[in-house]
Each structure stands twice: as C-alpha cells, then as structure tokens.
Amino acid sequence: MKLAIVSGGFDPVHVGHLECFEKAKSLADHLFVIVNDDKFLERKKGKPFMTWRERMTIIQALKPVTMAIVASDKDDTVCETLKWIHKVFKSRYDEILFCNGGDRTIDGDKPEHKLCLSLGVKPVYGLGDKIQSSSWLIAGEDSLEVLESRVANVVKSQGRQSNAGSLFF
C-alpha cells in the first residue's frame, strides 16, 4: 500500500488545492494532508484568513482526503510532522510519497526535501496547475469568469475538452 502526503496553509482552501489532493490520491491508497497552524500563517502573511480548525474541518470532509493533521512544527517547515507520520505509519505502507502542487518545483535545499530523502520518502512535484491562489481569492482577484477561463486553459493545455457550456454551475 502507498501513502501520499500533501502539506500547506490552505488559507483559504480552493479548487487548485482540491486538484492537487485528487492527483496525490491517484498515486496512493491513502492521502494525509498536513495543515499549517495559525502561527505559521501569522509568520508568513500576518494573520490567517481562516483558523486551522476551519481549514482542517473542510479538508477532512473532502473525498480524496483520508486524514487531515495539523502541523506540530514551530519553524516554517513541516519536518517534525513528516517525521512523526513516518515513524507512526511507515510499517503500514510499502511506499510513502510527499507530494507538492503544480506551482512547486524540485528544491534540493528545502528541509522537507532533504528529510524525505533521508527517510526514504519519495518527493513528488508538479501535481496540478496553478489555476487559483489563496492570495488571489483574498485580494478579490477571482471572479467566476476569471476562474472559468483559468480552468478552461488548463483543460485545453492537457488536451482535454469540456462538454459543459460552463465549468461551474
């Protein structure tokens, strides 16, 4: 059996995150999502838009997600949380993957990347396209038309065709 792990702030959760979760889940039997806590988001952007409890509740309810876990790290990584997941669950899985969204690229200097390699966890990059951003949503830059256009461009770039007149109902 395989376990996929995704991490992030998810503040707020949007369709780009869901796409990443679906792609990560397609690679594994189970998907764990590490949700950064409010302190992390305070350091990153001043204050969270949604509390970690709200984000956890929404993420746990999503179909591809097996388990949502709040990050226990006190720095700006999820290394301690990854170590804990690996320690507790490694005996249950043949392979563990640490998956990153489409806007992330291989960065051998990132602490999580180095940790994964040392633990035997396989880093996976480029899951999904940058069709939406939490910061775009908060800034009010996403109208339905703009989002439909982004999704349509991604669908077209992948050689797929939408049969619906509108991607959203």
Describe every region a protein language model picked out.
Residues M1-F169:
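Nucleotidyltransferase catalytic core that binds NTPs
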